[in-house]
Regions:
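N-terminal Rossmann NAD(P)H-binding glycine-rich loop of SDR-like oxidoreductase domains
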Residues: 3-23
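N-terminal Rossmann-fold cofactor-binding loop
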Residues: 30-35, 48-49
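Rossmann-fold cofactor-recognition segment
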Residues: 41-52, 71-72
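NAD(P)-cofactor binding segment of oxidoreductase domains
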Residues: 62-119, 136-140
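Conserved beta-loop-beta element that borders a ligand/cofactor-binding pocket
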Residues: 96, 135-159
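Short-chain dehydrogenase/reductase
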Residues: 107-137, 162-166, 189-190, 220
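Substrate-positioning beta->alpha
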Residues: 163-168, 181-206, 210-213, 225, ...
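Mid/C-terminal beta-alpha module of Rossmann-like enzyme folds, strongest
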Residues: 202-268, 275-278, 295-298, 305-334
């Protein structure tokens, strides 16, 4: 399959590129050429996506079977690119988000849950949900019968740059006593970035279209499963000290916010980790074991170091007060 990946250097895009190469696909990428050297075996096309004329020049003379787009900012950029790719590509896969569903999310929500409003021509990226919905509409405008909208849940695995698992692995690897947001039996729902990439590529090959909630099956793992497995992966002598949400809130320690288990005001959102993914599973979505996801993330971190921080996804280090955490640990040990 001749594939164009828009981006291709970070997190989801990088996983898509590497998975496609492993499959034997003919892979091109389009990006600014600033973040990382091109992956060996890739044909790099250089352009700033916010400059439609530069994108047009980069695309000129090329055609692809499929395009994968991970853009998360102003929808107008998606619309400009989709317009330029119309007639050059047979399939457009857009990595969207469950965030396009209107808040609050109902328990067990599927693809039919109400959606936020979005404008495909908007230049505003301050509202993530509206931007992603606008991106969806932009793709549908130019690929009405050939658009795959992957509404992803929490994406974990190697190359993660949004301050979840890398932060927890580093935190646990230091040893000692570490606060964890109780209860340990809280369910979590996530997808390994490589499983998402594999599904996107297989779906592109089949010409699958439509909107799909793409995350792991509900009820498969808990927060306790994740953190205890992370401890085992790091091999460190660390003690998890579980603190109830009310206690964390009282001490201004918003642990759990990184997993969407609580909001900045301390409230616990509904519907975050129990989405109905039966449609994607029926279309071939598969998920790997939790231990594999965590172990491979730890190997990547040790090999490449921590990813550069993102302004739109600050590390928990920026909002978790270490002194307040120690005070609560001292309180719980009395």
């Amino acid at each position: 399959m001749k594939l164009l990946v828009l981006g291709g250097t970070h997190h989801v895009g990088r996983a898509v590129v590497e998975t496609a190469l492993e499959r034997g696909d003919d892979v091109s990428t389009l990006n600014r050429g600033l973040s990382r050297a091109p992956t060996p075996g890739v044909r790099p096309l250089i352009a700033d996506r916010t400059d439609p004329e530069a994108v047009r020049r980069a695309l000129d003379g090329h055609e692809w079977d499929a395009v994968i787009d991970t853009w998360a900012w102003a929808p107008r950029v998606v619309r400009d690119t989709a317009r330029l790719l119309s007639g050059r590509a047979g399939h457009y896969g857009y990595v969207s988000s469950r965030g396009v569903h209107r808040w609050p999310w109902p328990a067990g929500a599927d693809e039919q849950a109400p959606l936020v409003d979005g404008d495909p021509g908007s230049t505003d990226d301050a509202d993530y949900a509206a931007a992603k919905r606008g991106g969806e509409l932009a793709v549908l405008e130019y690929f009405p019968e050939a658009a795959l909208l992957a509404r992803a849940g929490m994406i974990l695995g190697p190359y993660e740059d949004v301050g979840r698992i890398p932060w927890w692995l580093r935190r646990l690897s230091k040893g000692g006593r570490v606060l964890a947001p109780a209860p340990a039996h809280t369910p979590l729902q996530y997808i390994d970035v490589r499983d998402l990439a594999t599904w996107l590529l297989r779906s592109a090959e089949r010409g699958l279209s439509g909107a799909f909630t793409t995350t792991g099956p509900p009820g498969a793992i808990t927060l306790g499963d994740l953190l205890t497995t992370a401890l085992e992966v790091t091999g460190c002598d660390t003690e998890l000290v579980w603190a109830e949400p009310e206690l964390l809130l009282r001490h201004d320690l918003p642990l759990g916010m990184e997993f969407g288990l609580r909001l900045p005001d301390g409230s616990a959102p509904s519907g975050m980790h129990d989405a109905d993914v039966s449609a994607a599973l029926a279309e071939g979505l598969t998920t790997r074991p939790l231990r594999e996801t965590l172990a491979d993330t730890w190997i990547w971190l040790q090999s490449e170091g921590d990813p550069a921080p993102r302004a739109d996804a600050p590390s928990p280090d920026t909002w978790l007060d270490a002194a307040a955490e120690q005070r609560l640990l001292d309180h719980l040990s009395r």
